[in-house]
């Protein structure tokens, strides 16, 4: 099953367990957020929204907030000694798609537990 979601003015094709970077959304790392603007729900019988699919949403887990690469906007007017240099970095959110929900369903999966450190078993093997 897949879905096409719209967030931050962009559209993304997502499936469960996909990890992607999108424009910044509210939510602390480790929490589940629902994205309600679903344009298409695909599977055995695809459903196209007009413009959005009624009652459909995508539950995503917020993994991290970070900043994207620096983008430089440089303008120069030749022979005028006129230059302007501006730069910015986008605020991004790293998310993992938990599940695709239809019929106004609530998310059933919670955030994934963090992995245990691999150093603990190595210390036991040395004894």
Curated annotation (Swiss-Prot):
| Single GO molecular function | structural constituent of ribosome
- Keyword hit for Ribonucleoprotein: yes
**Which HAMAP family does the UniProt entry name for this protein?**
Ribosomal_bL21
What domain of life is recorded for the organism? Bacteria
This protein's GO cellular component annotations are:
cytoplasm; ribonucleoprotein complex; ribosome
Q: Supply the InterPro entries for this chain.
A: bL21-like (IPR028909), bL21-like_sf (IPR036164), Ribosomal_bL21 (IPR001787)
Q: Alphabetically, which GO biological process terms does the record hold?
A: translation
SUPFAM superfamilies with a match to the protein in the record? L21p-like
> What is the gene name?
rplU
Task: Say which family it is in.
Answer: Belongs to the bacterial ribosomal protein bL21 family.
Q: Where is this region: Disordered?
A: 102-127
State if Acetylation is listed as a keyword.
no
Instruction: Please describe what this protein does.
Output: This protein binds to 23S rRNA in the presence of protein L20.
NCBIfam families in the record, alphabetically? L21
Keywords assigned: Ribonucleoprotein, Ribosomal protein, RNA-binding, rRNA-binding
The record's note on quaternary structure and interaction partners says:
Part of the 50S ribosomal subunit. Contacts protein L20.
Q: What is this protein called?
A: Large ribosomal subunit protein bL21
Lineage from the top down? Bacteria, Pseudomonadati, Pseudomonadota, Alphaproteobacteria, Hyphomicrobiales
């Amino acid at each position: 099953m897949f879905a096409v979601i719209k967030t931050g003015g962009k559209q993304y094709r997502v499936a469960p367990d996909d990890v992607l970077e999108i424009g910044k959304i509210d939510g602390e790392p480790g929490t589940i957020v629902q994205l309600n603007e679903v344009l298409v729900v695909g599977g055995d019988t695809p459903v196209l929204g007009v413009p959005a699919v009624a009652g459909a949403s995508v539950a995503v887990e917020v993994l991290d907030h970070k900043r994207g690469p620096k983008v430089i906007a440089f303008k120069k007017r030749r022979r005028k000694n006129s230059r302007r240099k501006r730069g910015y970095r986008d605020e991004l959110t790293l998310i993992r798609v938990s599940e695709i929900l239809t019929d106004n369903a609530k998310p059933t999966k919670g955030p994934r537990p963090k992995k245990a450190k691999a150093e603990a078993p190595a210390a036991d093997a040395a004894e």
